From Swiss-Prot:
Family as reported in the entry's similarity comment: Belongs to the dicarboxylate/amino acid:cation symporter (DAACS) (TC 2.A.23) family.
Protein name: Serine/threonine transporter SstT
InterPro entries for the chain: Na-dicarboxylate_symporter (IPR001991), Na:dicarbo_symporter_sf (IPR036458), Ser_Thr_transp_SstT (IPR023025)
NCBIfam families cross-referenced by the UniProt entry: PRK13628.1
Transmembrane parts of this sequence: 14-34, 41-61, 72-92, 135-155, 172-192, 210-230, 282-302, 316-336, 351-371
Species of the source: Lacticaseibacillus paracasei (strain ATCC 334 / BCRC 17002 / CCUG 31169 / CIP 107868 / KCTC 3260 / NRRL B-441)
Length: 434
């Protein structure tokens, strides 16, 4: 029974959940027992999210390899830069178009809104070095991020077996989180019923404004910010490659809503472009967890919308801090459907917003997630391919072997690009040395 339920498209189930929740919220707002479904769903997410974030970041950091003969260094710089620039763009858009949400039962004042720079820094440092076990139990995401980065760095020195164990643990917890997310339609019924019964249709309409802001920002980043980065690296027209990656990778990712599922598609597309197999065989799978520009946008915009709703003044310093925090914490979630939403409590804690309030916003995220998560995944997955190709073309340009990107894209579309295997790359390198 569960297998048959799981085989049904999550998007279809969520759409049905939205319709059922909306109908029940309007027709029978007094049936408060329906709200329990939302509470159970949010409670399960609240329980699994800290462990999931901890293991994913730790696993991603432990896989970093240095010294390999590939374009890995350039790819990493592009991945991290793209995620950071995405977060900055999201914060800028949030300042230009501030949005307030309607949260049932939420007070308009944060628990402990930071008052000055000294208080913020002291609080951040104190929270970051908290006991890691307590952090997992209490949901202290700043400490979770800090310790996962340190432990992940330490794991780089361990054996492959140890790293495999950590990866398998992360995969196991991810599978548990995926099973919880499978029940999102039931949770959405409860959450939407509660929202409609307590805030009315007007409150729910604010979610549409939030969705439009999220999607518009992601489109702007992929069609303006990312192409500018490609141009800076290659000094060629970036749009043939940008649109091609969007077509071959972004469209499939939009419907699968999973960067991990899209990895084989990106690997084939890299081969079609004639990229170095030794390079893309590493960067594409890593991009499934390390390149999360779409996730950074979601975390930044939804966190600032929460801060606006709670009446928290966001200074320039805190906004910049949010950019870095969103960029770092987004590492590891692009391969999970709805994974970025689980990072909102960590980002919200920066402004003294309680975990309970933040999880209400996570619930809103799942309501709009049919579109938001699909667009986010498309941006993340397509940019994995975009920056993998850009890194190789940029390195070739620096070495005095510029590549005609438009011709490469055209050849890839016809399936006539020359494939660069590790053996061919080594032969070319040896001939240059001679």
């Amino acid at each position: 029974m569960y297998k048959r339920y799981k085989d049904v498209s999550l998007i279809l189930k969520i759409v049905i959940g939205i319709i059922v929740g909306a109908v029940l919220g309007v027709m029978v707002p007094s049936w408060s027992f329906i709200d329990v479904l939302g509470k159970l769903f949010v409670g399960a997410l609240k329980a699994i999210a800290p462990l999931l974030v901890f293991l994913l970041i730790m696993s991603a950091i432990s896989k970093y390899r240095s010294g390999a003969k590939n374009h890995f260094g350039t790819v990493i710089v592009l991945y991290l830069s793209a995620t950071l620039f995405s977060s900055i763009a999201a914060v800028a858009v949030s300042y230009l178009f501030p949005i307030k949400l309607v949260l049932p039962g939420a007070m308009k004042i944060a628990e402990s809104a930071p008052k000055d720079l000294g208080t913020v820094v002291t609080s951040l440092l104190t929270n970051a070095v908290a006991n890691p076990i307590s952090a997992l139990v209490e949901g202290n995401y700043l400490a979770i991020l800090f310790w996962s980065l340190l432990i992940g760095s330490g794991l780089r020195l361990t054996s492959a077996v140890t790293k495999k164990v950590v990866t398998e643990l992360a995969d196991t917890v991810s599978a548990v989180a995926q099973n919880v997310i499978q029940f999102a339609p039931f949770g959405i019924v409860g959450l939407l019923h509660e929202s409609l019964s307590k805030t009315g249709v007007k409150g729910v309409m604010a979610y549409g404004q939030l969705l439009m802001l999220l999607v518009a920002t992601m489109v702007f980043v992929y069609l303006v910010v990312y192409p500018f980065m490609v141009w800076l690296m290659t000094r060629q027209n970036p749009y043939p490659l940008t649109f091609w990656t969007l077509k071959v990778s972004g469209i499939p990712a939009f419907f699968t809503r999973s960067g991990a599922v899209n990895i084989p598609i990106n690997l084939k597309a890299s081969k079609d472009l004639g990229l170095n197999e030794e390079s893309y065989a590493i960067s594409i799978p890593l991009g499934g967890s390390a390149n999360s520009g779409g996730a950074a946008i979601t975390v930044s915009i939804m966190t600032l919308a929460t801060a606006n709703t709670m009446g928290v003044h966001v200074s320039i310093f805190l906004a910049l801090l949010l950019c870095f925090l969103s960029a770092i914490s987004a590492t590891g979630v692009s391969g999970i459907a709805g994974g970025s939403l689980l990072l909102i409590p960590m980002a919200a804690s920066l402004f003294g917003i309680s975990n309970d309030i933040a999880m209400q916003v996570v619930g809103i995220g799942f309501i709009i997630g049919v579109v938001q998560d699909s667009v986010e995944t498309a941006v993340n997955s397509a940019s994995d391919l975009l920056f993998t190709a850009t890194a190789e073309y940029a390195d070739d340009r620096r070495e005095g072997h510029p590549v005609d990107i438009r011709a490469k894209v055209k050849a890839a579309g016809k399936g006539t690009a020359e494939v660069v295997t590790p053996e061919k790359a080594n032969e070319a390198e040896e001939s240059e040395q001679v």
